From Swiss-Prot:
Protein name: Small ribosomal subunit protein bS20
Keywords assigned: Ribonucleoprotein, Ribosomal protein, RNA-binding, rRNA-binding
Biological process terms in GO annotation: translation
Lineage per the UniProt record: Bacteria, Bacillati, Bacillota, Bacilli, Lactobacillales
Gene that this sequence comes from: rpsT
PANTHER family, per database record: 30S RIBOSOMAL PROTEIN S20, SMALL RIBOSOMAL SUBUNIT PROTEIN BS20C
Family: Belongs to the bacterial ribosomal protein bS20 family.
InterPro entries attached to this UniProt entry: Ribosomal_bS20 (IPR002583), Ribosomal_bS20_sf (IPR036510)
Length: 78
């Protein structure tokens, strides 16, 4: 455990940010799985939006976001 006051605060913030980021990534994964289970235009838009939000927040790399959206788009086109 940290001894310096600022380090203690940063450790607490790290825990909060980790929870927030984990929840955001989980929501993204859930949206993708929902689309894969039942491909539809509405679920595609929701999954695509969730991927874009995760990319904007820096949770996933822009290339991964692009790759994921391309794969979902290909499944929708089938």
């Amino acid at each position: 455990m940290a001894n310096i006051k600022s380090a203690i605060k940063r450790a607490e913030l790290n825990v909060k940010h980790n929870e927030k980021n984990s929840a955001q990534k989980s929501a993204m994964r859930t949206a993708i799985k929902a689309f894969e289970a039942n491909p539809s235009e509405e679920l595609f838009r929701a999954a695509s939006s969730a991927i874009d939000k995760a990319e904007t927040k820096g949770l996933i790399h822009k290339n991964k976001a692009s790759r994921d959206k391309a794969r979902l788009s290909a499944k929708l086109a089938k």
